[in-house]
UniProtKB/Swiss-Prot annotation:
This is Undecaprenyl-diphosphatase. The chain crosses the membrane at residues 47-67, 83-103, 109-129, 144-164, 184-204, 218-238, 246-266. GO terms for biological process: cell wall organization; peptidoglycan biosynthetic process; regulation of cell shape; response to antibiotic. One of its GO terms (molecular function) is undecaprenyl-diphosphatase activity. The keyword Nucleotide-binding does not apply. Its main location: membrane. It is found in: Cell inner membrane. Keywords: Antibiotic resistance, Cell inner membrane, Cell membrane, Cell shape, Cell wall biogenesis/degradation, Hydrolase, Membrane, Peptidoglycan synthesis, Transmembrane, Transmembrane helix. GO terms for cellular component: plasma membrane.
């Protein structure tokens, strides 16, 4: 029997590694819980959301100088103000869809079959986009045209289907709209801050009354582990995709999804 602390460490590592890669952290966490007995039930379903602030904090730490500059300049600098408006415009579609359909998406689609098919289809799309002859026009994630931010936000809504990947949907849409690989990845990171913070706040509000002191300790372990892991992964990811693209992650998705389908077909 795996202790809660060990479960928290393992799930924290999975969250930190997969949250900002285009491979679906939610999908990997659901499959880990299903196939490796890494927690099931209401608390562990909520746990995967409650540890996300660790990954968010990693982005804030890595990009602190840029985010602080924007925060100081958004009332006086038109470029900084336009970026803040762009992030909010990209965030808004997820809020609307989440409030209207979030409950039904969770009830109907949060199962391992959907995750596996989504991983495979998303991997094929990622591979296709990576092989296109890109002629990027946008090289600065803080200076995209406003309509581009909106379209990326709409694409992010597709990632409410588990296995699609929030970062995958936003990176792919940004590249199709003219961003280079690094700028697409960086805007995906910036958009994660309000999106994941909102998801955390909503889940915590709904479930905090049912949590015990021990539960809070378990969440704290997962938080710290996801934070440390995410800092390492994000820095390595940016360096890797700038040179090599996303094909490795596309194959990762296809292989994990295929193995998952085989396991499900065998009755796991």
């Amino acid at each position: 029997m795996i202790s809660d602390a060990i479960r928290a460490v393992i799930l924290g590592i999975i969250e930190g590694v997969t949250e900002f890669l285009p491979v679906s952290s939610t999908g990997h966490l659901l499959l880990a819980e299903r196939f490796f007995d890494l927690g099931s039930g209401n608390f562990w379903d909520t746990f995967t959301v409650l540890i996300q602030p660790g990954a968010i904090l990693a982005i804030v730490v890595i990009y602190f100088a840029k985010l602080w500059r924007v925060a100081l300049g958004m009332f006086s600098n038109p470029a900084d103000r336009r970026f803040v408006i762009g992030v909010l415009a990209a965030f808004l579609p997820a809020v609307i869809v989440g409030l209207i359909a979030g409950k039904y998406i969770k009830e109907l689609l949060f199962n391992p079959w959907v995750v596996c098919f989504s991983l495979i289809v998303g991997g094929a799309v990622l591979m296709w986009v990576d092989q296109l002859d890109h002629r990027p026009r946008e090289h600065d994630a803080t200076a995209f045209p406003l309509p581009m931010y909106v379209w990326i936000g709409i694409a992010q809504c597709v990632a409410m289907i588990p296995g699609v990947s929030r970062s995958g949907a936003t990176i792919v849409s940004a590249m199709l709209l003219g961003a280079d690989k690094r700028a697409a990845a960086e805007f995906s990171f910036f958009l994660a801050i309000p999106t994941m913070t909102g998801a955390f706040a909503y889940d915590f509000y709904k479930n905090h009354a049912d949590m015990t002191t021990d539960d809070l300790g378990t969440v704290a372990i997962g938080f710290v582990v996801s934070f440390v892991t995410a800092i390492i992964v994000v820095k390595a990811f940016l360096s890797y995709v700038t040179r090599n693209g996303f094909t490795f992650f596309a194959w990762w998705r296809v292989i994990v999804g295929t193995l998952g389908l085989i396991a499900l077909a065998l009755g796991r």
